[in-house]
């Protein structure tokens, strides 16, 4: 007869070495990884081997602090106490073990709104992280304000919205500097950060760079700059030029940037979002794999992609509707520039239907995602006709008003080549079952002859309504052996 000890289950997970357990916990949210210390004595110090620390506030969490905290609190201290305590506790836990912990590879925090009282804490965090990771790769994501990227309409620190602040796009405008004096305090990054050769990823948002005379980031591969405070366009360009190994660049909401050149390195991914004062961009696109653009319909001279032979993946979001014929022509010419894409994600919520009259041909397109209020059938048919090799169609639908006197087109009019012989997967997200959505589902599924998989994400509602919508969609399908997913 076996002894009780022999029958007891063995904890094989706890038998793993500390560094391996820490690596496993690093893929969990930091708070959950810290809770593992309560499992047993074996796990008490495992958190010291977690190589990723990430904490963030919710967007809008600090919106009412001026009313409820600064005027009423008797003790004047930071109101971001939770995130400050969390980050400090996580870093102190590592310091208690002296040299026994593994190097920190990833450090991320996001303040909804960072006050000047937080500066001393952030200085301590970055000093520790940079000092203890001089010879190992390091990924930093430092966000000091959460809000809309587009500066045309952005949330102010009182929780409302403020109008667009239009800058000159230069470095030397005294009048522009005067207009910025009302701005709230901005955290200034430590200069030692720009000489830390261990950094592989650097994402900074709503802070001041204040670059030193010498910037040395030889191994930096991913750089993201969002709304730098008081740093001009020349500082942004100098930082980009000081990163010889850069392959992934994101520029967001930089209102003082008028031109940028990335011809001395070959990017694989480039994102340009809401830099409304930008006049010219020159990029070596010979190895570019992904392009992400957000802004107004760009002029022909704005984006120069040198050596581009076809960018496989593109994401396009126009934050301002084209209001004239010339702007609609610019939209068409821009879409022609990326017409060799195999994957396209188009945000069309600000685009009038007239923009699609000259929609170019995307002969290589296999994946298409359309995000915004659902397009009327005529426009949808026009887009599908221009993508003869489309295989996956995704509709990320947002709430919209159903057009009055909406006439249902003949189902045979949607018998376009891609639906008849190419489209294998259709996804409809945020399906609420209004007249336009039901019409579109019927037109698509009754003409998708080779469909293999469909997924419909229903909005929350009564079970009876969801069941009826599900049965209606299933009744529209003509293809056999389709994998059906309803969420």
Task: Briefly describe each language-model feature range.
Residues 50, 104, 135-137, 199, ...:
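Conserved hydrophobic position(s) of the canonical leucine-rich repeat
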Residues 463-487:
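C-terminal helix/juxtamembrane-tail motif
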Residues 337-369:
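Oxyanion-binding "anion nests"
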Residues 192, 213-216, 236-239, 260, ...:
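C-terminal per-repeat helix/turn "cap" of leucine-rich repeat
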Residues 2-255, 261, ...:
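Leucine-rich repeat
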Residues 270-338:
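Acidic, glycine-rich loop-and-beta core segments that form the ion-binding/anion-interacting portion
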């Amino acid at each position: 007869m076996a002894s009780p000890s022999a029958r007891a289950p063995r904890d094989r997970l706890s038998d793993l070495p500390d560094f391996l357990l820490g690596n496993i916990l690093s893929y969990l949210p930091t708070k959950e990884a810290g809770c593992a210390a309560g499992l047993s004595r074996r796990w008490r110090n495992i958190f010291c081997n977690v190589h990723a620390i990430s904490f963030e506030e919710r967007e809008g969490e600090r919106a009412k602090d001026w009313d409820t905290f600064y005027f009423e609190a008797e003790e004047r201290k930071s109101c971001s106490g939770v995130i400050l305590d969390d980050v400090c506790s996580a870093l102190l836990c590592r310091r208690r073990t002296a040299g026994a912990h593994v190097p920190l590879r990833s450090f991320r925090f996001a303040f909804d709104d960072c006050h000047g009282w937080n500066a001393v804490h952030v200085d301590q965090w970055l000093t520790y992280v940079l000092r203890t990771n001089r010879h190992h790769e390091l990924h930093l994501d430092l966000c000091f304000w959460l809000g809309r990227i587009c500066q045309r309409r952005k949330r102010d620190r009182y929780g409302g919205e403020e109008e667009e602040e239009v800058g000159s796009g230069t470095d030397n405008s005294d009048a522009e500097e005067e207009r910025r004096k009302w701005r709230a305090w901005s955290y200034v990054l430590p200069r030692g950060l720009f000489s830390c050769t261990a950094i592989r990823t650097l994402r900074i948002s709503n802070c001041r760079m204040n670059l030193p005379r010498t910037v040395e980031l030889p191994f930096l591969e991913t750089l993201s700059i969002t709304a730098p405070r008081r740093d001009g366009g020349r500082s942004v360009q100098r930082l980009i030029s000081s990163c010889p190994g850069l392959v992934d660049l994101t520029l967001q909401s930089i209102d003082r940037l008028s031109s940028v050149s990335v011809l001395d390195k070959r990017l694989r991914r480039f994102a340009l979002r809401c830099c409304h004062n930008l006049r010219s961009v020159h990029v070596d696109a010979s190895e570019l794999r992904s392009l992400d653009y957000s802004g107004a319909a760009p002029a022909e001279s704005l984006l120069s992609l040198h050596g581009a032979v076809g960018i496989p993946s593109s994401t396009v979001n126009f934050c301002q509707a084209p209001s004239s014929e010339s702007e609609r022509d610019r939209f068409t010419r821009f879409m022609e520039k990326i017409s060799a894409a195999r994957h396209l994600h188009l945000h069309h919520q600000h685009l009038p239907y007239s923009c699609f009259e000259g929609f170019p041909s995307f002969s290589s397109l296999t994946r298409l995602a359309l995000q915004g209020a659902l397009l009327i059938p005529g426009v949808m048919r026009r887009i599908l006709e221009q993508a003869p090799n489309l295989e996956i169609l995704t509709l990320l639908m947002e709430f919209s008003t159903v057009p009055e006197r909406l006439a249902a087109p003949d189902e045979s009019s949607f018998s376009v080549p891609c639906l008849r012989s190419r489209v294998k997967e259709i996804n409809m997200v945020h399906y609420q079952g209004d007249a336009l959505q039901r019409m579109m589902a019927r037109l698509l599924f009754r003409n998708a002859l080779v469909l293999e998989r469909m997924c419909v994400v229903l909005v929350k509602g009564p079970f009876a309504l969801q069941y009826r919508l599900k049965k209606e969609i299933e009744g529209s399908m003509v293809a056999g052996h389709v994998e059906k997913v309803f969420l």
